[in-house]
Amino acid sequence: MRRSFLLWVLVLGVVAQARAQAPATQFGFVFGSVAKVVQGTDTLAHAWAGGLNTPQFSTIDLDGDGRADLYAFDRQTARSYTFLNVAAASGTGRRWQYAPDYESLFPGDLSGWALLRDYDCDGRADLFTYANGGDIRVFRNVAGTGGRPSFVLANNQLSFPVANGFISNLNIGSYNTPAIQDVNGDGRLDILTYDFVGSTVLELYLNTSPGSCGGVSNFVQSTNYWGQVVTCPDCSSYQFAGATACRPYRIEHSAGHSILLLDLNGDGKLDLLDGRDNCPQLTRLLNGGTSTVDGLLTAGGASSAFPSAAAPVSLPVFPAPYSFDANFDGVPDLVVAPNMTDNTLDFVSMRRSIRLYQNGAASASAVPSFSLASDGFLQNDMLDVSEGSAPAFGDLDGDGLTDMLLANQADLVNGYYRASLYYYRNVGTAARPVFRLASDDYLGLAATAALMPSVKFESLRPALVDLNRDGALDLVYSVWNGTTNRLTYILNTAAASQPASFSTARASYFKPQGAAGSGVLPARQGDTPCFFDIDGDGYVDLLLGTNDTQEAGGSLRYFRNQGPAAGGNVDNLFVLANANYGQLLDNGSRPPYLAPAVADFNGDGKPDLLTLSGRGTVMLYSDFRSQNGTFAGTNELFFNNFTSQYEPARLGKGFILRFAAAAADLNRDGRPELYVGTETGGLISYLGRNGTVLAARPAAAAALALSLYPNPAAQAATAETAQPTSVRLFDLAGRLVRGASPLARTHRLDLAGLAPGLYVVQATAADGTSTSQRLAVAP
């Protein structure tokens, strides 16, 4: 105990001295993690990358070392992911390492699809991507600092000549992903795609740009009937040349194809792999023509049992194929991933949905031989709970370490599309947290919901908070039942510092009343709760981020805790105090799916408000409780190591994106980390940058003369002030752990049952003047 006590003293002294000498610089966040995550026997290599839903893969040299690194563009969220090709920890072999710094090198307005191909033969992969209306635009990769990519727009609209001297856009439609490859062997990149009108026939565009390698200035349409095949409405159904027409009166699938050309049988001609929207199969179509340009696809060469009847590709919706060396053996493998734009109608699982088919061929030029090697390429090394993840942190097992709950929008499990709550127990130490998956259905919420299939159980968003002031964390969760969204709570019947005891049979839900005479305020799908003492009365209040666009007000609602006035009825604990708290806007309009989090992120002793919107915007409102009316905040929060500048978040954008945020000081270093739940079902971990660990005491501190002793303390501490004050104790996530005391000059703080770590003691005088200091609770 004495050694631990002295360690705390040394840590506090070193930190205080270092911070006193540090220059005053802007606060922000940088990607990084303090915790490991273990599932089964595996430590997740990319635990905090944020999950993947619909990645489109390409290779590119990101760091200028001459090795092929990996780029993934997630279609659903329009987010870029970058992975470096690095040496394995064992010293032999290679592995992928998530490296988010490189994501900022790619254009921020990408959408639809993005593929990297070297069109000018300079050894640097260029960028082909969707343009508005279904056109294709191209960015040239020029040499950047340190050999890193730098993209410059080379052609904002590919085109080709048509009759009578007219020029037409090379338009592939909004849902197709083309094959961009050298089809005729002249060294130039050509384009094969389904037509933009109905996506029923294949069109081949040959690159005729000048030069031995060419560019992207000139294309001609070689044929609008490549392969002499027409797709039929049924999955894996085609009308081949000379065959009967497609069967009528079948259910039509939405137009959309993702294609890849590969020589699958070693005859020197490129064959076709075709993935279709709303279809699970990847169809192989062998080329029986005289050349790749003069392709001929036949019924005899078509198979939906690819690559083998024993292990065919079968994804729930819209498989898209990609060819690259995924396992570092020098032979290109096949990776297949979903390629739909969203999951709002399909209701499929987005976990373990990226298939890696290892190529067992002896060389890159040999006939490929694909076999299933992984059902979750990269995903299996990430925290990934399917989609719409939302975290909450707290000590659930009473061991003094912070555990993690991770909820999701929903997942398809055993035929039921239901939300669930994952429980990750912290099995590490106070300074080195390690999360181990303990349950993928904490409290059996998903299993119980599956017993009532007619009632939805989706958009689960948890919070851990002491509602009844007994020192034990209670569970609150927002959930959508198909008609309304409820804020459900379950009181913890265990004593403080003991393993949590939640009974779903005792679950109830808040009935927050509106302003006088307005009645109950409706709740919408995706509403996200956050608890914090807003008015400083010692009772935790409710901030509700909402997607409500019908009711008057804004996206952030402030519900005040009535305290004793509620008469002990937790159902009616909260009353609407402000329906448009902070008057928050995102680019001039009401931010959708707003998710709030409160903590002292910048270390100045004052709580800050952080919000995420469904557009991927992250805002920080420092010391928000001192602001009135429209809150002033910033979105330039995330440090770019390449430019040494702060930039807005790059979490993606889309029609419906659901994010969530939570703060937790997992390693007890005095700075809360930021954890962002993503639409893609994962978590991103950010560390504070240039925050203050021990906040400098302002002028008010001199007037109140707050003194804490002993500090560190184990069981109790004394707080003294020069004038009568009320004292409260918060953890670094902003949660009230000891309520307000009566006005006095001397206060005894009971620390029994508190987890070791740093806390904030706030002393407030009768006139509202307040000051804060950090208190270390020793083991």
Locate the predicted segments by residue.
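Beta-strand-rich domains and repeat architectures in extracellular enzymes and scaffolds
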Residues: 38-75, 253-262
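Blade-level signature of beta-propeller repeat domains, shared across WD40, Kelch, NHL, RCC1
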Residues: 652-694
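Blade-edge motifs of beta-propeller repeat domains
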Residues: 21-51, 86-109, 142-172, 209-253, ...
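Short glycine/acidic-enriched loop and turn motifs that connect beta-strands
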Residues: 77-78, 134-135, 197-200, 278-280, ...
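C-terminal outer-membrane/trafficking sorting elements
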Residues: 6-8, 699-709, 713-779
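Short consensus segments that form the blades of beta-propeller domains
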Residues: 46-49, 72-73, 129, 167-169, ...
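Beta-propeller blade termini
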Residues: 54-62, 110-119, 174-183, 255-264, ...
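Acidic/hydrophobic-patterned starts of short beta strands in beta-sheet-rich repeat architectures
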Residues: 64-74, 121-130, 185-195, 266-276, ...
